[in-house]
From Swiss-Prot:
One of the record's GO molecular function terms: nuclear receptor activity
Stretches the record annotates as Disordered: 14-60, 95-132
GO cellular component, one term: virion component
DNA-binding region residue numbers: 204-281
Gene3D superfamilies referenced in this protein's UniProt entry, alphabetically: Erythroid Transcription Factor GATA-1, subunit A (3.30.50.10), Human Immunodeficiency Virus Type 1 Capsid Protein (1.10.375.10), Retinoid X Receptor (1.10.565.10)
Family: Belongs to the nuclear hormone receptor family. NR1 subfamily.
Signal recorded as keyword: no
Additional information: THRA, the cellular counterpart of v-ErbA, is a thyroid hormone receptor alpha.
Gene name as annotated: gag
UniProt organism field: Avian erythroblastosis virus (strain ES4)
Protein name (Swiss-Prot/TrEMBL): Gag polyprotein
Domain NR LBD, chain residue ranges per copy: 317-555
Length: 555
């Protein structure tokens, strides 16, 4: 049988506290309240002499230790009693835990007079267990005090086999003061910081100041993080005049004693060669950080440019395709590169006062509208000629050619006008010959689309596109496979991919030093597609208002 007991009980049962004691008898069982009140009254009725006699140490009877004597007469074995003697339990007769018979409150004795014979209970019969009548509690307290520190109550297991008892060790031990003692493994603290070790240092390099593990080259010396921070803090806050030493500056500075004397530690920092002038103040530290950030940004750009330089350039076939597209654009672009010298500004009084209303409700200046329709017809004709000069376009069915031209015509005309934006005069040159301002173009029939074209011109002016780049961008807009009603979608998509690949390789060849130039330029395709979608509805209104200006084929 196993049962949970305290270590004090285990100490008693194993004989660590002295002899053997008797188990508690029937008198130890808690009495009812009425009986306790009667016993209390009887005890109060005792005379003072009787109580003093009980407490006198010199008259105290020696506790009996029961051996193999008879339980009735107390003689040695072999008496004439009817009941044969039997050995008592192993815990009977201990001086540490006496019989509770005759022990009153707080162990001061009961009603039985000192020296009186205590009745003994035979084995197997109910009655009072054998044991001493009275216990010397003063001696027991003295023995317990001399044996060592108080025993900590802890659970044990009493077993019938194997070791007599086994302590159940908890995760942490609770001491008498209520505090916990943690495991030693949880209290381990690293004596030094590992830190980042540069590759230029040996793995076991030591600090020249305290001998701890070094983390780098600080202020012209190989030091640890602690000595580096101590030296920097001392110089920045000017603390060294306040340092003092109680041993006349003769302290030995090592990893253990470095925090005990600041003066000797600072003197050793100076003696090993740490430079005070290398400690930066706030302004110098900010300037240094700014310089570091600038160097990082410069290296990042250099690495980006270096990576762009290794991108593929156009192949021989792509160069031939690029040449054909460029020539097609130059032959159909009015005025060419001399458009600034040959342009004519629209009179300022034209397009400033819209009068007539179009079907969508916008006000239109009829004079400006008439001027714009005059240059629209040759502009559309040049876009058609550009498409016919492309070898891949002529191989498509006639139905697909018409759909592609209707979809891209306004986009290409807007692109050609946007690349001729003049930031000085804030004008766009239409068809290479007429320079107009924002309000004139808006009141001439384009409405809010004019704002989008002018904004596109401002953004494209920063790209500084050449004729080849404009020509390839027009070819990409022309070969859009997402137009509604196309028959040879796969063939058109393949043509657009070939133009895009040649365009990208050309950008890598010419603009490799500009980060993200290719991706930013492709974003302008979406802007042009949006302008073209809104343009189509505007030209339908122009056809209704001026049916004689545009032929059905041109619309």
């Amino acid at each position: 049988r196993e049962e949970q007991v305290t270590s004090e009980q285990a100490k008693f049962w194993l004989g660590l506290g002295g002899g053997r004691v008797s188990p508690p008898g029937p008198e130890c069982i808690e009495k009812p309240a009425t009986e306790r009140r009667i016993d209390k009254g009887e005890e109060m009725g005792e005379t003072t002499v009787q109580r003093d006699a009980k407490m006198a140490p010199e008259k105290m009877a020696t506790p009996k230790t029961v051996g193999t004597s008879c339980y009735q007469c107390g003689t040695a074995t072999g008496c004439n009693c009817v009941t044969a003697s039997a050995p008592p339990p192993p815990y009977v007769g201990s001086g540490l835990y006496p019989s509770l018979a005759g022990a009153g409150e707080q162990g001061q004795g009961g009603d039985t007079p000192r020296g009186a014979e205590q009745p003994r209970a035979e084995p197997g019969h109910a009655g009072q267990a054998p044991g001493p009548a009275l216990t010397d509690w003063a001696r027991i307290r003295e023995e317990l005090a001399s044996t060592g520190p108080p025993v900590v109550a802890m659970p044990v297991v009493i077993k019938t086999e194997g070791p007599a008892w086994t302590p159940l060790e908890p995760e942490d031990t609770r001491w008498l003061d209520g505090k916990h003692k943690r495991k030693s493994s949880q209290c381990l603290v690293k004596s030094s910081m590992s830190g980042y070790i540069p590759s230029c240092l040996d793995k076991d390099e030591q600090c020249v100041v305290c001998g701890d593990k070094a983390t780098g080259y600080h202020y012209r010396c190989i030091t640890c993080e602690g000595c580096k921070s101590f030296f920097r803090r001392t110089i920045q806050k000017n603390l060294h005049p306040t340092y003092s030493c109680t041993y006349d500056g003769c302290c030995v500075i090592d990893k253990i004693t470095r925090n005990q004397c600041q003066l000797c530690r600072f003197k050793k920092c100076i003696s090993v060669g740490m430079a005070m002038d290398l400690v930066l103040d706030d302004s110098k530290r900010v300037a240094k950080r700014k310089l570091i950030e600038e160097n990082r940004e410069r290296r990042r750009k250099e690495e980006m440019i270096k990576s762009l330089q290794h991108r593929p350039s156009p192949s021989a076939e792509e160069w031939e395709l690029i040449h054909v597209v460029t020539e097609a654009h130059r032959s159909t672009n009015a005025q060419g590169s001399h458009w600034k010298q040959r342009r004519k500004f629209l009179l300022e009084d034209i397009g400033q006062s819209p009068m007539a209303s179009m079907l969508d409700g916008d006000k239109v200046d009829l004079e400006a509208f008439s001027e714009f329709t005059k240059i629209i017809t040759p502009a559309i004709t040049r876009v058609v000629d550009f498409a016919k000069n492309l070898p891949m376009f002529s191989e498509l069915p006639c139905e697909d050619q018409i759909i592609l031209l209707k979809g891209c015509c306004m986009e290409i005309m807007s692109l050609r006008a946007a690349v001729r934006y003049d930031p000085e005069s804030e004008t766009l040159t239409l068809s290479g010959e007429m320079a107009v301002k924002r309000e004139q173009l808006k009141n001439g029939g384009l409405g809010v689309v004019s704002d989008a074209i002018f904004d596109l011109g401002k953004s494209l002016s920063a790209f500084n596109l050449d004729d080849t780049e404009v020509a390839l961008l027009q070819a990409v807009l022309l070969m859009s496979s997402d137009r509604t009603g196309l028959i040879c979608v796969d063939k058109i998509e393949k043509c657009q991919e070939s133009y895009l690949l040649a365009f990208e390789h050309y950008i890598n060849y010419r603009k490799h030093n500009i980060p993200h130039f290719w991706s930013k330029l492709l974003m302008k395709v979406a802007d042009l597609r949006m302008i073209g979608a809104y343009h189509a509805s505007r030209f339908l209104h122009m056809k209704v208002e001026c049916p004689t200006e545009l032929s059905p084929q041109e619309v």
